[in-house]
Amino acid sequence: MNITGIITEYNPFHLGHELHLKSSKEITNCDGVICVMSGNFVQRGLPALTDKWTRTKMALEAGVDLVVELPTLFATSSAEFFAFGAVSLLNSLNVVNNICFGSECGDIDLIKKLSEIIINEPPLFKEYLKDYLKEGLPFPKARSKALMKYLDDNNYKIDFSYLEKVLNSSNNILAIEYCKSLYKLQSSIKPFTIQRLGADYNDEKLSKNEIASASAIRKSIYTSNIEESLDFMPEYSYNLLKNTSFSDLDKMFDLVKYAIVSNPNVLKEIPEASEGIDNKIIQNIGKANSLDELINLCKSKRYSYTRLNRILCHVLLNVNKDLLSLRKSSPNYVRILGFNNKGREILKEIKKNSEINIVNKLSKAKSDSLLEFDIKATNIYSFLNPSVKINSDYLISPIIFR
């Protein structure tokens, strides 16, 4: 079987996702699709709009054959760890031939070239990176500038204003990290990319006759009503959303505030909360009335909005240094969220070709720190979304789509 892997959040599943899935099948000419999907918390450091089982149903309705969960520790991390967790999981299955992801540039050769430089770290590139970091630039910005300078020195023929745009676009950054992970793992999986169409990844406005971003759809659902988003998602996705409840960001803020006020040292356990940002958060926690307000009071050139969101999410989930160290290795299990008939065949192939632990029912799963953290994350998510009960991971079986 020719199997394609895709890495998603489907938060929620919209028309852009539908196009990506269809195009991925066409460009790779595959027999089946495995989707690695974030669980109940996502890469922005927020609870998913709706739970992982509802989003799994959306994926299966759309034509994904097998949905597996990206462990929460990777799902709530920076692009580098998010990508490594997802790619290493796909690689460990030993059945995936291709990976297909969206990017703003749609240029797989450029993405591969950039990721190759980053993974090989030529001495001159390392020197430039060090210099830009000394200037106080955040790591992603410093790396982008170092890459541009290195390529310029090596007479790489490219419009540098275009390259700067490439290096500062969300999906391109993830695409580079996906390829970097493939190089790191010496994987035989072949990468493909599809140019992202429609609204920008971070665009929060819904515009008629344009594919909306998930950010805009979420904002519309939270601030007005779900009916406004009908034109921007498939009917099956809309119907599933209409019959579920959404996570409550105000409740998340209350829980984060409680965690920090009751134990200010909680921030010291999170390596990303360094360089005095922990003190800044503590100073502003009493002044803010919402998560958004707290982040805006604390953000700086070095600490972006999303980076702070992830730090606060890790406070909520009580992440510590020992847990974070697990991100350096590939997950040694795969949690099955749902499948169709073809997905069942793919699972048989995984069992034949891979030694990875396949988790269908938690009651039969081997003890694993990453898996235990996922269970805890779902239990915390149950405080934010009334559709989810404590111990839902034990109570809900994989979705079987017929």
From Swiss-Prot:
Keywords from the UniProt entry: ATP-binding, Cytoplasm, Ligase, Nucleotide-binding, RNA-binding, tRNA processing, tRNA-binding
Single GO MF descriptor: ATP binding
Entry's Gene Ontology cellular component terms: cytoplasm
Gene3D superfamilies documented for this protein: HUPs
InterPro entries hit by this protein: Rossmann-like_a/b/a_fold, tRNA(Met)_cyd_acetate_ligase
Coiled coil ranges: none
First-tier enzyme category under EC: ligase
Residues engaged in binding ATP: 7-20, 102, 171, 196
Subcellular location(s) of the protein: Cytoplasm
Catalysed reactions, semicolon-separated: cytidine(34) in elongator tRNA(Met) + acetate + ATP = N(4)-acetylcytidine(34) in elongator tRNA(Met) + AMP + diphosphate
Gene Ontology biological process terms, A to Z: tRNA modification
EC number(s) from the headed UniProt entry: 6.3.4.-
Keyword Ribonucleoprotein: no
Entry similarity comment: Belongs to the TmcAL family.
Described function: Catalyzes the formation of N(4)-acetylcytidine (ac(4)C) at the wobble position of elongator tRNA(Met), using acetate and ATP as substrates. First activates an acetate ion to form acetyladenylate (Ac-AMP) and then transfers the acetyl group to tRNA to form ac(4)C34.
Protein name, per record: tRNA(Met) cytidine acetate ligase
Organism the protein comes from: Clostridium perfringens (strain ATCC 13124 / DSM 756 / JCM 1290 / NCIMB 6125 / NCTC 8237 / Type A)
Lineage: Bacteria, Bacillati, Bacillota, Clostridia, Eubacteriales
The encoding gene: tmcAL
